[in-house]
């Protein structure tokens, strides 16, 4: 019934298996990928008819993580996989980027690739398996897929490169890098790094590139046995058509490209296609040429003009040389109500960035196959249509916005303080207000400025730069700080972010058949020089974090309590913690390890909440004086609430220095009286006295004294505490960063 074909290779100590012919047999290409306990189904479907006139490859990649793959039921009301998560979007883009450039340039058939995780093993990198499976499925399909791609993940642990590190290993790694390519060249790089040098990054890419070559071999073997006939492709346009357009319109195109302003240049270039189509109207009517062929030939001429100017004259369309950076302007604190803000402008690209602090309750909860976890740092990239003067409605975040936001997140995350050093959650919103190339790197620069102005103690300022490439044969030019047109007509988009000491993020996308390591080395060094120049301009405005947080930022403190006191703060059904939050206006977050974080809009509210918590968790010392409230009067005495939610008993003999007939003749419910703690009974209940308490010189407080040895009312040896854990919950000897206020200088204003 099944004609299954399987190929396998031992890769990094695990067996990687690719098979076809058993599942999803009606798809044009279907491959099951297995490694460890991970199983993915990758399919490729190609439409029979071309979608002419669209000017781009209609390729859609969908990566899906099925909940059952990890033995889970989806959350939410419907208990069903819904819209793609950010993780699924990011992996979909990761698959798309190395694959898209490898189709025949004239191929415009609708193509859909789906990669579904059917079984999940945290010891294997499913995103890497998805890239491999998608490439294999396309190689089996009729799509004119010209090269075979594979990928690998690289970590750096204890100075050694690690192939396909597990999630546990990645937590200790200085590098998280994905590299994809063909047998000859690198096609895509995506990474987050902890201040690594250009040399280390290049060596990591080489390591990953060499590591996936055995995988390419088994994909080729599978394709040789199971592939379907490829679609026959024609040239995009006749060569004679291009020559005719050049002869008639090249001068006008060159004049338009000579305009330095993007908007004016675009306006003039947009007028040319209509003129060209009008000239060839009879040929279109006679079906000698199609609109799509004419427009494609015109785009090729525009590309030739831009590329020749760069390669032959070292001159770009805005007049810069290949290494020049556009003019930079930085401004901070322009949004008075934001916790931090900055405006970063580089040429005609501009990003308005704001920073907001929140509590641990505001952290992003992420539900993934690995399990549920929280993200303390959030970065949202917004690309509104007005930034490129387009009249379009605002929509939900696109895949591009999610991807650009994650790249900027990767660039900033390595230089952020940890939660002990800075207890807030952080949200950065970067709105691209103008765009002419490299808006994601403008986001990185603006985010660094806004964070420093907000007072976040980042390790160092971060800047980003986008590099381009124009390559013809062996001749090539690497471009610093590319424009939108240079990105569109160029061969590479290579984004590098980092500090003056090293790289924090790197992303490379190639539009040709690949680049070699010589080009990458030149691009990395040129990017380093450009990054240093940008940092120099940024440092003129702000070079280190402000010492004070914004007056609008919330106040916070973190204390450490005994774990057995957690339930006392929470109370039955959360009654106590709710009451504290409602009366103080603060927010409280309690961790399982006994860390209590308190947040409030101002210091007064913070103090109220903190005092209430202290009153609950402290262990009062014998001999302390308190202002107590009478809660119940009995014939034998009275119950007094003397601190927090703690009640003690005053025997009738301890109510007054004089003999009294009844307790009710002296005390009434609700009375405020001074009481002194004189000991505990055999059940651990507090014993109090009112006699002479108001004459004691000790003042009322809710913080216990240190090492106070008091005697009981009989002047005998000091009573033992109720149990061996009666040491104070409020431990003054705790580490300064985790006990009281974490650096009061910064977090209180």
Swiss-Prot record:
One GO location term (cellular component): cytosol
Annotated KH domain residues: 554-613
SUPFAM superfamilies named among the record's database cross-references: Eukaryotic type KH-domain (KH-domain type I), Nucleic acid-binding proteins, Polynucleotide phosphorylase/guanosine pentaphosphate synthase (PNPase/GPSI), domain 3, Ribonuclease PH domain 2-like, Ribosomal protein S5 domain 2-like
Compartments (UniProt record): Cytoplasm
Compositionally skewed regions (Low complexity) per UniProt: 699-713
Cofactor(s) demanded: Mg(2+)
Family according to the record: Belongs to the polyribonucleotide nucleotidyltransferase family.
HAMAP family assigned: PNPase (MF_01595)
Designated name of the protein: Polyribonucleotide nucleotidyltransferase
Organism: Rickettsia conorii (strain ATCC VR-613 / Malish 7)
């Amino acid at each position: 019934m099944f004609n299954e074909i399987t190929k396998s290779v031992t890769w990094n100590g695990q067996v990687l298996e690719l098979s076809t012919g058993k599942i999803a047999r009606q798809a044009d290409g279907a491959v099951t990928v297995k490694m460890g306990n991970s199983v993915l189904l990758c399919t490729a479907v190609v439409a029979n008819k071309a979608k002419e006139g669209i000017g781009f490859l209609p390729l859609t990649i969908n990566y899906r993580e099925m909940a059952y793959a990890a033995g889970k039921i989806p959350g939410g009301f419907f208990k069903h996989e819904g819209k793609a998560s950010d993780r699924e979007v990011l992996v979909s883009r990761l698959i798309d980027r190395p694959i898209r450039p490898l189709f025949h340039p004239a191929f415009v058939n609708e193509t859909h690739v789906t990669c579904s995780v059917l079984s999940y093993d945290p010891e294997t990198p499913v995103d890497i398996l998805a890239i491999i499976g998608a490439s294999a499925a396309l190689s089996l399909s009729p799509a004119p897929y010209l090269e075979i791609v594979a990928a690998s993940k690289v970590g750096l642990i204890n100075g050694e490169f690690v192939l396909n590190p597990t999630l546990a290993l990645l937590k200790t790694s200085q590098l998280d890098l994905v590299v994809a390519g063909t047998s000859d060249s690198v096609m895509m790089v995506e990474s987050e790094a902890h201040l690594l040098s250009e040399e280390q990054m290049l060596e990591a890419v080489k390591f990953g590139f060499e590591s996936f070559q055995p995988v390419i071999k088994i994909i080729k073997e599978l394709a040789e046995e199971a592939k379907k006939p490829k679609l026959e492709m024609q040239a995009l346009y006749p060569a004679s058509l291009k020559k005719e357009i050049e002869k008639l319109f090249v001068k006008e195109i060159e004049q338009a490209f000579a305009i330095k302003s993007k908007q004016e240049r675009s306006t003039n270039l947009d007028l040319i296609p209509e003129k060209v189509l009008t000239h060839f109207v009879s040929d279109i009517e006679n079906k000698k040429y199609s609109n799509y062929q004419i427009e494609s030939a015109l785009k090729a001429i525009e590309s030739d003009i831009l590329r020749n100017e760069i390669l032959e004259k070292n001159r770009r369309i805005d007049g810069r040389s290949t290494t020049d950076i556009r003019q930079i302007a930085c401004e901070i604190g322009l949004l008075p109500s934001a916790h931090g803000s900055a405006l970063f402008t580089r040429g005609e690209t501009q990003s308005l960035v704001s920073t907001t602090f929140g509590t641990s309750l505001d952290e992003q909860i992420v539900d993934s196959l690995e399990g549920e976890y929280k993200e303390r740092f959030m970065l949202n990239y917004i690309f509104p249509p007005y930034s490129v003067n387009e009249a379009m409605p605002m929509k939900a975040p696109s895949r591009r916005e999610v991807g650009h936001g994650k790249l900027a997140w990767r660039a900033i995350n390595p230089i952020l303080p940890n939660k002990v050093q800075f207890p807030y959650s952080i949200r950065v919103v970067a709105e691209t207000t103008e765009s002419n190339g490299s808006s994601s790197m403008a986001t990185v620069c603006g985010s660094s400025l806004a964070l420093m102005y907000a007072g976040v103690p980042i390790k160092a300022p971060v800047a980003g730069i986008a590099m381009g490439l124009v390559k013809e044969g062996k001749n090539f030019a690497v471009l610093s700080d590319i424009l939108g047109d240079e990105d569109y007509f160029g061969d590479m988009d290579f984004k590098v972010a980092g500090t003056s000491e090293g790289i924090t993020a790197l992303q490379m996308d190639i539009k040709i058949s690949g680049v070699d390591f010589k080009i990458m080395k030149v691009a990395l060094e040129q990017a380093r020089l450009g990054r240093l120049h940008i940092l120099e301009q940024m440092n003129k405005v702000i070079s280190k974090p402000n010492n004070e947080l914004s007056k609008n930022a919330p106040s916070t403190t973190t204390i450490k309590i005994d774990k057995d006191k957690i339930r006392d703060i929470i109370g039955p059904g959360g009654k106590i913690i709710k009451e504290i939050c409602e009366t103080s206006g603060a927010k409280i977050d309690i961790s399982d390890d006994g860390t209590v974080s308190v947040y409030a809009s101002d210091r007064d509210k913070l103090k109220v909440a903190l005092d209430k918590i202290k009153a609950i968790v402290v262990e009062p010392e014998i001999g302390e004086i308190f202002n107590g409230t009478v809660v119940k009067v009995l014939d034998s005495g009275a119950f007094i609430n003397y601190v927090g939610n703690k009640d003690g008993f005053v025997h009738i003999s301890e109510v007054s220095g004089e003999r009294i007939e009844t307790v009710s003749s002296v005390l009434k419910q609700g009375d405020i009286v001074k009481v002194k703690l004189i000991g505990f009974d055999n059940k651990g209940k507090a014993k109090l006295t009112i006699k002479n308490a108001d004459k004691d010189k000790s003042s009322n407080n809710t913080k216990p004294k240190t090492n106070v040895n008091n005697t009981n009312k009989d002047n005998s040896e000091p009573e033992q505490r109720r149990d061996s854990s009666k040491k104070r919950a409020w431990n003054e000897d705790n580490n300064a960063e985790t006990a009281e206020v974490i650096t009061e200088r910064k977090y209180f204003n």
